[in-house]
Amino acid sequence: MNSIDAVVRYSPLRNNLCNLPSAITTMLFSADFNIQQIIVELSWVPHQRAAQRRIAYCGWAGGITKTSSSNPVIEIDRSLASAIDLQENVNVTVNVHIDAVKAITVELEPVTSNDWEIVETHAQVLETYLLNQTRCVYPNQVLVVYPTPQTTARLLVKKIEPEVSTFAQLFNDTEVQIAPKVQKRPSISSVRSDSSGHRIRRVRSSTSTATGRRSVTNNGEVLPSMLRRSITLPNNTYAHVNDSKSGGYKVYCNLNELIPALQNAHFVSVSVLVGPGTPDRTGLTSSKIKQLNDSIDQAAQTQTNAAGSSHPPESSYTETGKVIAELVHDSKSPKGNVGLSELLACSLGIENTVGNLISLEQARKPLIKNPLDTLLTQLMQLLSPLLDSCTFTNCVKLPKIGTLLPNGGLLQFKRIKSGWTTPLGKDNVSLEIGEEILRPESFIPSYDLLPDRKTHVRTQSDQYPTAQENLIESLSKIASGGSLLFGTSGSGKSLVISQVAQIVTNKGHFVKLLNCDKIMSESYNNLRGIFEDIFSEVSWKAPSLLILEDLDSLIPAEQEHSDSSQSRQLSEYFISKLSALSINRDITILASSKSKESLNSLIFTTHLIEHDFQLRAPDKEARKQILQSYLDTLNVFCSEGELLNNIAVETEGYLPKDLKVLCDRAYHDLISRDILADSDSELDIEESSTPILNGSVGDIANKQSEIENGISGLELTNNSSSTIAVDKHGATIQKDNFDSALSGYIPQSLRGVKLQKSDVRWDDIGGLRDAKSILLETLEWPTKYAPIFSSCPLRLRSGILLYGYPGCGKTLLASAVAAQCGLNFISIKGPEILNKYIGASEQSVRELFERAQAAKPCILFFDEFDSIAPKRGHDSTGVTDRVVNQMLTQMDGAEGLDGVYVLAATSRPDLIDSALLRPGRLDKSVICDMPDFDDRLDILQSVTRNMNVSKSVNLSSVAGECSGFSGADLQALAYNAYLKAVHEKLTKDESMAMAGEMDDNDDKKRMVECFQFSGNTEKKSLIELKPSDRATVIKKLEHLYQGNGNHAEGETKSKLATTAANSVIITSKDFEDSLSETKQSISQSEKRKLEAIYQQFISGRDGNMPDGTASNEIGARSTLM
């Protein structure tokens, strides 16, 4: 292909490829060549005097350049151009090669040891993306690789197999070998035994490497320096170092890692490099802050522009004030880190921090103060030539004179108060050296002004997350990939995170904690700016741990009918930035949220979050430890040894925050009772002092002053609860205090959860002895005998099916067992969870079990279970089929039902899907059978317990006449008998009122006549009042007639009379009348049908799965497909 001439332009391609002008690309596209096959040859003359042209080879990136004026343009990366010494705007000749020799083996060698460190760190990245960056190699080529967007490394091509004279093409099977190149570092003993001449020669050679830096003094002296990451003491990483505030200024580091010049130094000059997150108090004046920020930006821009050059420029970072410190060898110091003594860290303004970059520079030679006489003699000798050549006046400025006057000075003549002055010769002139003028104030604080260690050391929090040691240990391990800590509000996430941050900091890692709740209202652009600063800081101080607390408030899950654009934008931004940071630097992410579902799902699509930990509600032993921890903080002791154990049992489902509030309420109750007791004792003293008034006036005055002093002391005590706490040192808390605290308190997990409370007591249910016994074994025993069941290796049953005849007490039994066992109760009806839309019913079931899990220990009761979970395959809409599938998933144990018991009630167990009746789901089936004679008698006694039944009533005979009655029928029988007695009572009261037998307070009889009138002229039939209504009206008139005389006494007598008059007594006749009107709710035919179904359910099930064939029986349901 014909060659063309083009002009070189730099472009940030970040590879060893180039973009070609359209004159070439048009022919390549028309010829249908593969981009990977094209090799571009560039030849140019380096400068006008050069006699030989230079040649380089590269691949084609597939891009097309824009032609400027009439000259074609070729674009190339700046780093690649610097490696092949190709300047911008140079004319080059471009040739395109199609057929090239394929390289089998390529041997490379890093140009410097720093290049080898970069290659070794990012070996996996280079192995993956090397072919995307390079298409060909040629002998003695300086190959530039780009492991990260910010770094480059240069490799020299040493050998190519097969040997070629021009170039060879790389392909997938090419083996690339990179030889290591490690910098040799001499030992400490050999360095410190060298002479000063050897030392200077090594320093000058080391300053040309990238590991060292150079600092030039005003006198032109070159001082070597290095950059290191700092860890301020005290820190567990340097726990073996005995450091104190009086220990002086010291730097602890491994001298083997330093450059030779610093290895031999006993003192170094320490300064802080200003970077992202550097404290503002690091020895800087306020006027320099803007200049430092500008210098950082300029340094970053210069480094970007000069990346990949053959001689990289020196760093232009800005340093703060310098402090001379002693260099101490510490072989246990982490690699790349140095420890700063507490005094040195406070002087630099970075106390109690980790990760700041500091510069270690060889200290200058100290100025030796000469004797005054010698100094004056030398100064006079140097000033003699100036005295001959010029005349000095008062306050003339003197020039800089070596080490005598390094900053120059002012000449001042002494004044003579009186007398005549005569000129003197030079030999008679006397000199004196005064004080320094404009001495700069040191930024190092005075020793006495330095804060104590206790203000800087991160002491362990008083509220340590009890019973979470394993979780904290897992979170504290810095590993690849992020972690998510989720739990409900009040579960202790913030406390665990603060403890993890403290542990990680003590390991020498930088920790950045951000509470996302505080910035959730910011706009997207502002949030990007905030996180750009945070990412820069954690990258600058790496290795780092970035903690994002309450991340779900910033990037919540996308809702169906809400605008989630900002959440999606932030999620994509986090994924791109944090993924790049995690790969390039040692940065780990720890986020917290209320649940995994509350976060945007995009976060979990990548490996940004690889580990998740859930904070569950503490178990009984953990609750006991938490209660003990809070009581120890309050300095309160328990009155009984088993008190905390009993309280832990009663607080099932309480979160750590709830337990803290409970302890505070109990402590407040204790203090309140003490205050009331003290108040009562003071009042008793005051009352006992009343007889003193009969004495003399002096005695009365003295006693009055004593009472006033006692009252004032009482008021001082009541004004401060802390004073009472001191007086009650080691106070003992009682069970009554906890009972008062528990009374009326709703745990945070139960707030907003709809719980049903039933007034039915366990004694109110008659009969059902077997069913009640099985329920107590399942629900009450695991809590009552927890130590025995905890050692049981078997899985406890958590599901019970109550089936039986209608009206036999299934629902009543389920509502009463919750109160009997102290469990929460959630009742569900079918229409509450059934929804025709796909996914809505499943979501309702999931939310239902989540509610039960939050309210555990809890009973989840499904009434009429056959309507919610019928056999699958017979529903044309598929709603109940999906509900059954979801319930199988929730009850199977995969989701976990710890503390949640499922009760289901039905009268048709044959209609329930058989998969729900297998072990592990509804483990036990309990029948609620028709009551026999003993059960009927027990039911009647339970129902009539709160009724006034005449002693003449024989409940046994009534129970004998109720054969075939269910429990609901017997209850209806008793209620009907009570209504009969009420009607008789009302009729009797009406007749007494009409006959005038009810007397007033004066025992005068009155006649009450009831009549109706209407103002309407139209004739209408009057409505006659019922006897009950007439009696009510008469009673109201009676109360109005009584008036106000003797109100209190009359009211008391009226109440007693009313109670006696309103008592309703049920007689045998009432039961006989009720029995004649009450019929059985279950017919004999229905009873026989249900009995056959229950018998088949108990003993006739074969366990076979349905084969999917529709039933041909009459009345069977089928699905139209």
UniProtKB/Swiss-Prot annotation:
The keyword Transport applies. It is a peripheral membrane protein. Transmembrane segments: none annotated. InterPro entries: AAA+_ATPase (IPR003593), AAA_ATPase_domain (IPR050168), AAA_lid_3 (IPR041569), Asp_de-COase-like_dom_sf (IPR009010), ATPase_AAA_core (IPR003959), ATPase_AAA_CS (IPR003960), CDC48_domain_2-like_sf (IPR029067), P-loop_NTPase (IPR027417). It catalyses: ATP + H2O = ADP + phosphate + H(+). PANTHER family: AAA-FAMILY ATPASE (PTHR23077), PEROXISOMAL ATPASE PEX1 (PTHR23077:SF12). GO terms for molecular function: ATP binding; ATP hydrolysis activity. Keywords: ATP-binding, Hydrolase, Membrane, Nucleotide-binding, Peroxisome biogenesis, Protein transport, Transport. Component of the PEX1-PEX6 AAA ATPase complex involved in peroxisome biosynthesis. The complex acts as a protein dislocase complex that mediates the ATP-dependent extraction of the PEX5 receptor from peroxisomal membranes, an essential step for PEX5 recycling. Specifically recognizes PEX5 monoubiquitinated at 'Cys-6', and pulls it out of the peroxisome lumen through the PEX2-PEX10-PEX12 retrotranslocation channel. Extraction by the PEX1-PEX6 AAA ATPase complex is accompanied by unfolding of the TPR repeats and release of bound cargo from PEX5. Its EC number is 3.6.4.-. SMART domains: AAA. Residues 205-217 have a biased composition (Low complexity). This is Peroxisomal ATPase PEX1. Pfam families: AAA (PF00004), AAA_lid_3 (PF17862), PEX-1N (PF09262). The gene is PEX1.
